[in-house]
Amino acid sequence: KNKGIEDLIDVYSNLLKKENFNKLELNLLIGGVGSENYIKSLNKKISNKNIQFLGYVEDRFSFFNSIEIFIFPSYSEGLGLVLLEAMSYGVLCITRDVTPMNSIINNGENGFLFKDNNELLEKIEKALELNSSEKDNMVKSALEKIEKSYSIMQMYLSIDKAYN
Protein backbone atom coordinates (compact mmCIF):
# COMPACT_ATOMS: atom_id res chain seq x y z
CA LYS A 1 0.00 0.00 0.00
CA ASN A 2 2.91 2.33 0.81
CA LYS A 3 4.16 1.93 -2.76
CA GLY A 4 1.02 3.58 -4.20
CA ILE A 5 0.28 0.72 -6.61
CA GLU A 6 -3.46 0.70 -5.82
CA ASP A 7 -3.59 4.44 -6.56
CA LEU A 8 -1.83 3.87 -9.87
CA ILE A 9 -4.25 1.11 -10.89
CA ASP A 10 -7.25 3.34 -10.01
CA VAL A 11 -5.84 6.26 -11.99
CA TYR A 12 -5.02 4.02 -14.97
CA SER A 13 -8.60 2.72 -14.98
CA ASN A 14 -9.93 6.29 -14.89
CA LEU A 15 -7.61 7.32 -17.72
CA LEU A 16 -9.00 4.59 -19.96
CA LYS A 17 -12.53 5.92 -19.37
CA LYS A 18 -11.62 9.31 -20.84
CA GLU A 19 -12.75 9.82 -24.41
CA ASN A 20 -9.40 10.96 -25.81
CA PHE A 21 -7.49 8.04 -24.23
CA ASN A 22 -9.87 5.08 -24.35
CA LYS A 23 -8.90 4.17 -27.91
CA LEU A 24 -5.15 4.15 -27.23
CA GLU A 25 -3.29 0.92 -26.58
CA LEU A 26 -2.00 1.80 -23.11
CA ASN A 27 -0.42 -0.95 -21.05
CA LEU A 28 0.39 -0.67 -17.37
CA LEU A 29 3.44 -2.74 -16.40
CA ILE A 30 4.04 -3.01 -12.66
CA GLY A 31 7.52 -4.05 -11.61
CA GLY A 32 8.84 -4.92 -8.17
CA VAL A 33 8.27 -7.48 -5.50
CA GLY A 34 5.45 -7.77 -3.01
CA SER A 35 3.90 -10.43 -0.86
CA GLU A 36 2.03 -13.12 -2.76
CA ASN A 37 -1.17 -12.29 -0.84
CA TYR A 38 -0.92 -8.60 -1.75
CA ILE A 39 -0.42 -9.39 -5.45
CA LYS A 40 -3.37 -11.81 -5.35
CA SER A 41 -5.59 -9.16 -3.73
CA LEU A 42 -4.59 -6.64 -6.42
CA ASN A 43 -5.26 -9.16 -9.19
CA LYS A 44 -8.79 -9.68 -7.84
CA LYS A 45 -9.47 -5.95 -8.23
CA ILE A 46 -8.18 -5.83 -11.79
CA SER A 47 -10.45 -6.58 -14.69
CA ASN A 48 -8.19 -5.02 -17.31
CA LYS A 49 -6.02 -7.32 -19.41
CA ASN A 50 -3.62 -4.44 -20.11
CA ILE A 51 -2.28 -4.46 -16.55
CA GLN A 52 0.64 -6.82 -15.96
CA PHE A 53 2.55 -7.61 -12.77
CA LEU A 54 6.13 -8.32 -13.78
CA GLY A 55 7.58 -9.03 -10.35
CA TYR A 56 11.29 -8.39 -9.95
CA VAL A 57 12.70 -6.87 -13.16
CA GLU A 58 16.11 -8.35 -13.75
CA ASP A 59 16.73 -6.97 -17.24
CA ARG A 60 16.39 -3.27 -16.56
CA PHE A 61 17.84 -2.33 -19.95
CA SER A 62 15.04 -4.12 -21.83
CA PHE A 63 12.39 -2.93 -19.38
CA PHE A 64 13.27 0.77 -19.50
CA ASN A 65 13.74 0.68 -23.27
CA SER A 66 10.26 -0.81 -23.70
CA ILE A 67 8.33 1.90 -21.81
CA GLU A 68 7.49 5.50 -22.65
CA ILE A 69 6.56 6.76 -19.19
CA PHE A 70 7.78 5.64 -15.78
CA ILE A 71 5.39 6.32 -12.89
CA PHE A 72 6.76 6.10 -9.36
CA PRO A 73 3.72 6.40 -7.05
CA SER A 74 5.47 5.51 -3.77
CA TYR A 75 4.47 7.49 -0.67
CA SER A 76 7.98 7.30 0.80
CA GLU A 77 11.43 6.17 -0.27
CA GLY A 78 14.97 6.51 0.98
CA LEU A 79 16.44 7.65 -2.32
CA GLY A 80 14.26 6.29 -5.08
CA LEU A 81 17.07 4.61 -6.99
CA VAL A 82 14.64 3.21 -9.55
CA LEU A 83 13.58 6.78 -10.39
CA LEU A 84 17.21 7.69 -11.07
CA GLU A 85 17.57 4.55 -13.19
CA ALA A 86 14.51 5.41 -15.27
CA MET A 87 15.80 8.94 -15.81
CA SER A 88 19.24 7.63 -16.83
CA TYR A 89 17.60 5.42 -19.47
CA GLY A 90 15.89 8.46 -20.97
CA VAL A 91 12.37 7.60 -19.82
CA LEU A 92 9.95 10.40 -18.99
CA CYS A 93 9.19 10.17 -15.25
CA ILE A 94 6.19 11.00 -13.09
CA THR A 95 6.60 10.69 -9.32
CA ARG A 96 4.81 11.59 -6.12
CA ASP A 97 5.68 15.02 -4.69
CA VAL A 98 7.51 13.73 -1.60
CA THR A 99 11.08 13.96 -0.34
CA PRO A 100 13.54 13.07 -1.85
CA MET A 101 11.80 12.62 -5.22
CA ASN A 102 10.84 16.30 -5.33
CA SER A 103 14.53 17.21 -5.06
CA ILE A 104 15.27 15.03 -8.10
CA ILE A 105 12.34 16.01 -10.33
CA ASN A 106 11.70 19.67 -11.16
CA ASN A 107 8.00 19.62 -12.05
CA GLY A 108 7.43 20.27 -15.75
CA GLU A 109 11.16 20.59 -16.45
CA ASN A 110 12.68 17.11 -16.17
CA GLY A 111 9.56 15.14 -15.27
CA PHE A 112 6.30 15.60 -13.40
CA LEU A 113 5.32 15.61 -9.72
CA PHE A 114 1.88 14.83 -8.33
CA LYS A 115 0.27 15.13 -4.88
CA ASP A 116 -2.89 13.02 -5.28
CA ASN A 117 -4.71 10.76 -7.74
CA ASN A 118 -6.36 13.68 -9.56
CA GLU A 119 -2.97 15.28 -10.17
CA LEU A 120 -1.50 11.93 -11.22
CA LEU A 121 -4.22 11.56 -13.83
CA GLU A 122 -3.57 15.11 -15.02
CA LYS A 123 0.20 14.52 -15.26
CA ILE A 124 -0.21 11.25 -17.18
CA GLU A 125 -2.51 13.04 -19.64
CA LYS A 126 0.00 15.86 -19.97
CA ALA A 127 2.87 13.40 -20.56
CA LEU A 128 0.90 11.50 -23.20
CA GLU A 129 0.05 14.76 -24.99
CA LEU A 130 3.65 16.05 -25.20
CA ASN A 131 4.98 16.39 -28.70
CA SER A 132 8.31 14.71 -29.45
CA SER A 133 10.30 17.94 -29.06
CA GLU A 134 8.78 18.69 -25.63
CA LYS A 135 9.38 15.12 -24.49
CA ASP A 136 12.97 15.16 -25.79
CA ASN A 137 13.66 18.40 -23.90
CA MET A 138 12.32 16.94 -20.63
CA VAL A 139 14.34 13.75 -21.07
CA LYS A 140 17.47 15.77 -21.91
CA SER A 141 16.96 17.86 -18.77
CA ALA A 142 16.56 14.66 -16.71
CA LEU A 143 19.77 13.21 -18.13
CA GLU A 144 21.60 16.46 -17.32
CA LYS A 145 20.27 16.29 -13.74
CA ILE A 146 21.54 12.70 -13.39
CA GLU A 147 24.95 13.63 -14.77
CA LYS A 148 25.22 16.78 -12.65
CA SER A 149 24.03 15.35 -9.34
CA TYR A 150 24.05 11.54 -9.40
CA SER A 151 26.87 10.34 -11.65
CA ILE A 152 29.57 8.11 -10.18
CA MET A 153 31.98 11.07 -10.23
CA GLN A 154 29.49 13.31 -8.40
CA MET A 155 28.87 10.61 -5.79
CA TYR A 156 32.63 10.22 -5.31
CA LEU A 157 33.08 13.98 -4.91
CA SER A 158 30.20 14.15 -2.40
CA ILE A 159 31.65 11.32 -0.32
CA ASP A 160 35.14 12.80 -0.53
CA LYS A 161 33.81 16.19 0.58
CA ALA A 162 31.95 14.61 3.52
CA TYR A 163 35.07 12.89 4.80
CA ASN A 164 37.57 15.71 4.19
Write out the residue ranges for each language-model feature.
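Short, structured helix-loop element that forms part of the nucleotide-activated donor/catalytic region
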Residues: 17-19, 27-50, 54
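Short acidic/histidine- and often glycine-rich active-site loop of Leloir-type glycosyltransferases
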Residues: 84, 98-108, 112-113
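Aromatic "clamp/platform" in nucleotide-sugar-dependent glycosyltransferases that forms part
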Residues: 56, 75
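Short hydrophobic beta-strand element within catalytic cores of glycosyltransferases
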Residues: 92-95
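Conserved acidic donor-binding segment of nucleotide-sugar-dependent glycosyltransferases
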Residues: 107-108, 112-118, 127-132
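A conserved mid-protein helix/loop that constitutes part of the nucleotide-sugar donor-binding site
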Residues: 1-16, 37
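A short, well-ordered alpha-helix in the C-terminal region of glycosyltransferases
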Residues: 134-149, 157-161
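A structural motif in glycosyltransferase catalytic domains
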Residues: 8-12, 28, 120, 159
